[in-house]
Design a protein with these regions (language model features):
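Short acidic/glycine-rich loops and adjacent helix/strand connectors
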Residues: 1-355
Length: 355
């Protein structure tokens, strides 16, 4: 019997999962216990619940896996700040102390936190790290009913990747293609979330819900100025309009000038038809990109099944458009498509790919 504990934490949507011999036994999100929406803290309560539900002690666990690789994320941060210098100096000064104090030493930090669950837990070598998008892909493919599938993941950013394509076949999952930061469909959508006055990494569903009340009259402005979309759905974002790579905001003055208004202050300004039209426009662009990617993948790999995960896969309207296009015979979406599902995916990847 092999027991694996998967953990996601320290960005948003912390969670824990336990699988035993490849079977999902327990999975829980920390916010359900703390009542803090998108709780990013170490998932102590979720781990306690999972251990209790599985009727095991932490020391019984054979392997513990974190859903992403902190050193690669730190590499991205450093390379990004160097590439955009001198822009981003304030953001750099704010980020570095956190990384140098805690995040770079995540294995030791995890070990110290894990010991609080079980005084007998003393083996730091049980702790492993998965790739962020591999965790997403595994969370979508391995629980799916398919023996073989194309697996598309899209979110803000993992270590470097923002969009990946993998092929899953039985116990194997191989990433074939990647789009890298700063070019990100998830961050593009989050930029408009910010611009319309909603909270990033939280209010994207509100932007999606706002879209039906508007008309996509700004679609042309988006595709002509902000994003270059290729025939296969791959894309390139014009960083002249964004601050997210190095700044403390998602968009900048050039973005404001393009659409004729500053970002909405939700404490002072009500939503207007302008914001509804903006929402409709970015929603349509997102749907068209996802459909183009889906069509090109079906044509290239000719596999009838599609699995989806990553934060963008929480856009159920876009998922519905892919389904309506009848590109694939079958589509399976990981319900916990965001980072919470990464805890499950990391554990499943370690079990299946390690076999």
């Amino acid at each position: 019997m092999k027991i694996i504990l998967g953990i996601s934490a320290f960005y948003h949507d912390s969670a824990a999962s336990i699988i035993i011999d490849g079977k999902i036994i327990a999975a829980a999100q920390e916010e359900r216990f703390t009542r803090k929406k998108h709780d990013s803290s170490y998932p102590f309560n979720a781990i306690e619940f999972a251990l209790d539900y599985a009727n095991i002690k932490l020391n019984d666990v054979d392997q513990i896996i974190f859903f992403e690789k902190p050193f690669l994320k730190f590499e991205r941060l450093l390379e990004t700040y160097v590439a955009f210098a001198p822009k981003g100096f304030k953001s750099f000064c704010m980020a570095m102390p956190i990384w140098l104090k805690d995040k770079l030493f995540q294995k030791k930090m995890l070990f110290n936190e894990l010991k609080k669950h079980d005084n007998n837990f003393k083996d730091e070598q049980k702790i492993f790290f998965s790739d962020h998008h591999l965790s997403h892909a595994a969370s979508a493919f391995f629980p799916s009913p398919f023996e073989e599938a194309i697996v598309l993941t899209a979110d803000g950013v993992g270590e470097w990747a923002t969009t990946t394509v993998a092929i899953g076949k039985k116990n194997n999952l191989e990433i074939k293609k990647e789009i890298h930061f700063p070019h990100s469909l998830g961050l593009l959508y989050s930029a408009f979330t910010y611009y319309t006055g909603f909270k990033v990494n939280s209010g994207e569903y509100k932007l999606m819900g706002l879209a039906p009340y508007g008309k996509p009259i700004y679609e042309d402005k988006i595709v002509k100025n902000l994003i270059d979309i290729k025939k296969d759905g791959s894309f390139w974002l014009n960083q002249d309009y964004f601050n997210y790579a190095t700044g403390l905001t998602m968009t900048n003055d050039k973005f404001d000038n393009l659409f004729g208004q500053k970002a909405r202050d939700s404490k002072k300004e009500k939503l207007t038809q302008f914001h509804m039209d903006i929402a409709a426009s970015i929603q349509k662009v997102t749907e068209e990109i996802m459909i183009k990617i889906a069509k090109s993948l079906k044509e290239e790999f000719n596999i009838p099944n599609l699995c989806l995960a990553g934060g963008v896969a929480l856009n159920c309207v876009a998922n519905g458009k892919i389904l309506k296009e009848k590109i694939f015979d079958n589509i399976w979406v990981q319900p916990a498509a965001g980072d919470a599902g990464g805890s499950l995916g990391a554990a499943l990847a370690l079990w299946h790919i390690d076999q």
